[in-house]
């Protein structure tokens, strides 16, 4: 069992880095965190064991695969296929295989391709392995995080500049949300876990560790930064008060604590994009999940890997489901530094850079603020799902698609 005071001290450096900078944790995780370089030294030793366990899992669950795959409906399939434009003989990388919905659609569009299917979730990897048995010449299953992708690809003999297209479908999959034991959903009671690959890294902190260990200020910062929660201080205070009585270990327990900080009329007062009522704890769950899985830092490293392994003229398609992800993708494609304040819009940043250049100020400063463009946008504006997409899959309502061609 984790000793919470020690856990809190261990994360002190991590919190101070991004709290002082005012931006999400992009490249600032300290050496003490489990998911960084120190922990990755164990990766080589674990890799074979992980893959063997996943293979055993998929052999023992063959009958369940079709059901599992149906849990996740791929989003904006037509738009993804249009932007990737798969052609005979091309090579692709799906960096978020999930249940394989997009991969299958690509294969249906053009079967004479090779597709590397990556996912950090061992359950998704097992599905990819199963699909590779059906398409042995096309599918290459890979288990790992975005930050491990470069190593995995190089070990598989894939050289930089190889891929004709890379797909990223970010966020939490329906398979994860609909499995109470994973602890992602506030609507289904389960252990407060939220780790996408906790089975591979048992020492990786869970959502329960986060809400029980961090002080009130740190919790509020997590909720405000990763959940864009305007009531972050109030919710953090409620969490700290509740855990002083008993540890917070279940998803619906946390949801009830958050709800208890507000009058009953406010619990479902918020509306989603479909004007449906959403629980007041939704943003809290999002924030904790993003923090636990280091999702924004992983996204940035995934984008860099995609750029490195795409050939000139290769296409990147990225689907995001909240504004923080979309902002990172947009800035990356426009060559704007991730160290700039996130409350400064891309338009403001471009204007600011132009003003610096026109005044003949420090050219090095200008180049730091905006790197040379490496991408040509396929669509100038972000794409949103069609009404039919949202009707078929309400979870697609917040999807945003950005696509670009590597120059």
From Swiss-Prot:
Keywords: Methyltransferase, Mitochondrion, Phosphoprotein, S-adenosyl-L-methionine, Transferase, Transit peptide. S-adenosyl-L-methionine binds at residues 100-102, 119, 146, 169, 176. Coiled coil: none annotated. It is an enzyme of class 2 (transferase). It catalyses: cytidine(839) in 12S rRNA + S-adenosyl-L-methionine = N(4)-methylcytidine(839) in 12S rRNA + S-adenosyl-L-homocysteine + H(+). GO terms for biological process: rRNA base methylation. It comes from the Eukaryota. Belongs to the methyltransferase superfamily. RsmH family. This is 12S rRNA N(4)-cytidine methyltransferase METTL15.
């Amino acid at each position: 069992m984790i000793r919470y005071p020690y856990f809190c001290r261990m994360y002190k450096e991590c919190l101070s880095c991004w709290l002082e900078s005012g931006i999400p944790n992009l490249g600032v995780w300290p050496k003490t965190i489990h998911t960084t370089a120190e922990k990755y030294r164990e990766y080589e030793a674990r890799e074979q064991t992980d893959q063997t366990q996943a293979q055993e899992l998929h052999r023992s669950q063959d009958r369940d695969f079709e059901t599992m795959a149906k849990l996740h409906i791929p989003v904006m399939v037509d738009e993804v296929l249009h932007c990737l434009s798969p052609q005979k003989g091309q090579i692709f990388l799906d960096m978020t295989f999930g249940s394989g919905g997009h991969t299958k659609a690509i294969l249906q569009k053009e079967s004479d391709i090779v597709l590397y299917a990556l996912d950090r979730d061992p359950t998704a990897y097992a599905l990819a392995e199963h699909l590779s048995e059906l398409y042995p010449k096309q599918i290459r299953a890979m288990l790992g995080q975005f930050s491990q992708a470069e190593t995995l690809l190089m070990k598989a003999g894939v050289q930089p500049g190889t891929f004709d297209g890379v797909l990223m479908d970010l966020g939490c999959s329906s398979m994860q949300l609909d499995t109470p034991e994973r602890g992602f959903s506030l609507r289904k009671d389960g252990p407060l876990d939220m780790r996408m690959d906790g089975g591979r890294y048992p020492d990786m902190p869970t959502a329960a560790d986060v809400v029980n260990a961090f002080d009130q200020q740190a919790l509020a910062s997590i909720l405000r930064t990763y959940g864009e929660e305007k009531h972050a201080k109030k919710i953090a205070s409620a969490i700290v008060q509740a855990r002083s009585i008993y540890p917070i270990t279940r998803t619906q327990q946390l949801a009830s604590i958050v709800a208890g900080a507000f009058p009953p009329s406010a619990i479902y007062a918020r509306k989603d994009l479909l004007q449906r009522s959403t629980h007041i704890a939704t943003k809290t769950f999002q924030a904790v999940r993003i923090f636990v899985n280091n999702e924004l830092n992983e996204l940035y490293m995934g984008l860099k890997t995609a750029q490195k392994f795409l050939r000139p003229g290769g296409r990147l398609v990225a689907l995001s489901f909240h504004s923080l992800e979309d902002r990172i993708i947009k800035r990356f494609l426009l060559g704007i530094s991730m160290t700039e304040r996130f409350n400064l819009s891309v338009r403001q940043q471009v204007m600011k850079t132009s003003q610096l250049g026109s005044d003949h100020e420090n050219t090095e400063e200008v180049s730091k603020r905006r790197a040379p463009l490496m991408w040509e946008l396929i669509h100038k504006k972000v794409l949103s799902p069609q009404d039919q997409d949202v009707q078929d899959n309400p979870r697609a309502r917040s999807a945003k698609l950005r696509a670009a061609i590597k120059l």
